[in-house]
Amino acid sequence: MDFYIRHTWDSLPVDHKPVKIRFSPGEDGLLMQVTAPFFNDPPAPAGPPGEPFPGLWDYEVVESFFLNSETEQYLEVEVCPYGQHLILLLNGKHNAFMQQLPLSFRANIEDSTWHGEALLPWRYFPQGINKMNSYAIHGSGAGRTYESLYPVPREDLQEGQGPDFHRLEYFQDFTLQSIMGEDWVQPESDLWDLARK
């Protein structure tokens, strides 16, 4: 299932080829494949490729959020062109109770495009996913650009408002069964059991 990020966070069209995110069945998880323009701005994070990097959202990054809108439990996945990644498990808006989990992720840069492939283990997902949103960020300083699959509609914008990727009310319908098959049953997660304690 393919998704294309064609707008900035505030519903303006992007001025480049859209970021493409593909979700498909993987081995014991969801396969997430990213194809995106490579801006090389800002420079690479200082951490080693293949490892979690805190604050990755300050770099060139593509993110996907998977939400249960009834419990407001969600998984945030961040990947970048240089191989670093960041996983956050959130129990309520902005409330990360676990982060920097390991991830099978590889990325490569070819000229002006980068490709990334991550396997998201089922244990990272809360039960009852019914909404999703995805984002892309690049640039530095005044040129920092925030893009959204499901952006804030122009008519909802408030004066002085900035981008906030945790505006859960703008996420749109999405289920894991739409990718895995209607009869697929999501495995239980020991990690999300911790959120209930």
Swiss-Prot record:
Q: Which Gene3D superfamilies match?
A: 2.60.40.1190
Family under the similarity heading: Belongs to the UPF0462 family.
Q: What is the protein named?
A: UPF0462 protein C4orf33 homolog
